[in-house]
């Protein structure tokens, strides 16, 4: 039996989907895989890892708020670390690969507590333009670091980095090279807000679209990710405005949604930005305002600087501001086409294979 590779990833889509993409490549290359995560992501029960060993660590995903919450979070992470050390010792793992988020801290830290002869190789992937808090903590162990951006803020001076890009799901990778056709009659607008939608988009976007000219409203087809408790209200706004809409809390056909879209409105998480670039799509980005170190702002700025996107900070994200921007873009489809070309140039295809290559190079060292 081969010594397994342990994949450590938080249960949110931004951490889990890149991990699954890399794991898929490793599995195709014949590696045995083990997942260490938290309990948040249901896909661990249905996707690649369904029939592979999984460990949901005690304390993984507990960040804590307030003094008592932080103390509880630290204690939970310590419990998870001890649990991970026991599991890693029994597995005799060849490598531990982290994809960010607090759930990656226990297994990767625990790997450094093993005797040197049993210590697995350590690789982390950073999906943002700013080194995340978990990866910043783990970087003190001098792991190999795969980056999604050529420039990553907060990296240690002696960091051993390799630019790989952000691994995306196979169906989205297949969109690379898709030729963008600017809207002529129908305008397909995709609105997504992270793993489970974002309430700010449910509040602002319908109002902004309802204020568009009648001509644009008749031409619009909106596909929007909306929290379940907002569905009825938002659908009513679109219906009253005469706008066709497909709304749901979660879309399983994301590649098809991207392929059909003329413009995307959404957050600027690492996975989202990479998927927009891979699909070659123009976008309006509203970075998550509470993201630590403003990594979403840095991610989005990379597309803005390339001419591939427009960014509106959430305090400035009003219905009036969005209506004005959309009116300009829909009136000048060549702006959307130019942004789509720029987005395509930002894409880094085959990132999952490149991360897998880095892991295998570590195994050979």
From Swiss-Prot:
It is found in: Cell inner membrane. Its EC number is 2.4.1.227. Its main location: membrane. Signal peptide: none annotated. It catalyses: di-trans,octa-cis-undecaprenyl diphospho-N-acetyl-alpha-D-muramoyl-L-alanyl-D-glutamyl-meso-2,6-diaminopimeloyl-D-alanyl-D-alanine + UDP-N-acetyl-alpha-D-glucosamine = di-trans,octa-cis-undecaprenyl diphospho-[N-acetyl-alpha-D-glucosaminyl-(1->4)]-N-acetyl-alpha-D-muramoyl-L-alanyl-D-glutamyl-meso-2,6-diaminopimeloyl-D-alanyl-D-alanine + UDP + H(+). It comes from the Bacteria. GO terms for molecular function: UDP-N-acetyl-D-glucosamine:N-acetylmuramoyl-L-alanyl-D-glutamyl-meso-2,6-diaminopimelyl-D-alanyl-D-alanine-diphosphoundecaprenol 4-beta-N-acetylglucosaminlytransferase activity; undecaprenyldiphospho-muramoylpentapeptide beta-N-acetylglucosaminyltransferase activity. GO terms for biological process: carbohydrate metabolic process; cell division; cell wall organization; lipid glycosylation; peptidoglycan biosynthetic process; regulation of cell shape. Cell wall formation. Catalyzes the transfer of a GlcNAc subunit on undecaprenyl-pyrophosphoryl-MurNAc-pentapeptide (lipid intermediate I) to form undecaprenyl-pyrophosphoryl-MurNAc-(pentapeptide)GlcNAc (lipid intermediate II). Belongs to the glycosyltransferase 28 family. MurG subfamily. This is UDP-N-acetylglucosamine--N-acetylmuramyl-(pentapeptide) pyrophosphoryl-undecaprenol N-acetylglucosamine transferase. It comes from Gluconobacter oxydans (strain 621H). The lineage of its organism: Bacteria, Pseudomonadati, Pseudomonadota, Alphaproteobacteria, Acetobacterales. The gene is murG.
């Amino acid at each position: 039996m081969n010594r397994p590779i342990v994949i450590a990833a938080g249960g949110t889509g931004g951490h889990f989907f890149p991990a699954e993409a890399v794991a898929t490549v490793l599995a195709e290359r014949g590696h045995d895989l083990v997942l260490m995560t938290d309990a948040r992501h249901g896909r661990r029960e249905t996707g690649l890892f369904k029939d592979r060993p999984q460990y949901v660590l005690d304390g993984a995903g507990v960040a804590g708020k307030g003094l008592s919450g932080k103390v509880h979070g630290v204690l939970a992470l310590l419990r998870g670390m001890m649990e991970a050390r026991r599991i890693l010792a029994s597995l005799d793992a060849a490598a531990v690969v982290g994809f960010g988020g607090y759930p990656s801290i226990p297994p990767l830290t625990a790997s450094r507590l093993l005797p040197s002869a049993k210590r697995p190789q350590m690789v982390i992937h950073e999906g943002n333009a700013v080194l995340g808090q978990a990866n910043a903590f783990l970087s003190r162990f001098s792991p190999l670091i795969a980056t999604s951006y050529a420039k990553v803020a907060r990296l240690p001076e002696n960091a051993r980095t390799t630019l790989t890009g952000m691994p995306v799901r196979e169906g989205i990778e297949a969109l690379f090279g898709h030729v963008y056709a600017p809207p002529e009659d129908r305008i397909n607008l995709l609105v997504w807000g992270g793993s489970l939608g974002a309430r700010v988009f449910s509040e602002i976007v319908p109002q902004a679209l309802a204020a568009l000219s009648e001509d644009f409203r008749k031409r619009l087809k909106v596909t929007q990710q909306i929290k379940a408790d907002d569905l009825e209200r938002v659908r009513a706004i679109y219906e009253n405005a005469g706008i066709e809409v497909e709304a749901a809390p979660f879309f399983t056909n994301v590649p098809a949604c991207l392929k059909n879209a003329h413009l995307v409105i959404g957050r600027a998480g690492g996975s989202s930005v990479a998927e927009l670039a891979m699909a070659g799509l123009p976008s309006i980005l509203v970075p998550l305002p509470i993201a630590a170190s403003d990594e979403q702002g840095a991610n989005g700025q990379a597309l803005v600087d390339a001419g591939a996107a427009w960014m509106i900070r959430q305090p400035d994200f009003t219905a009036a501001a969005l209506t004005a921007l959309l009116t300009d873009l829909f009136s000048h489809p060549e702006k959307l086409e130019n942004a789509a070309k720029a987005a395509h140039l930002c894409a880094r295809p085959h990132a999952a294979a490149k991360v897998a290559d880095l892991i295998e190079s570590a195994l050979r060292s």
